[in-house]
């Protein structure tokens, strides 16, 4: 999965695997992989003006694991 730098708020980079529907986010505090993420959620997160607001509202509740 290719990680794209974003350097916004508490986020450093993110990447998405459309086959596995996994979103990987590198925070300043570590890397988390979120599962079952639809592509449209990733696309909207990528262009969101406030990454923190979008993350808290649309991504945080998905299943996740720390690391890869």
Where are the predicted features?
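Acidic/histidine-enriched, beta-strand-rich ligand/metal-binding domains
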Residues: 1-68
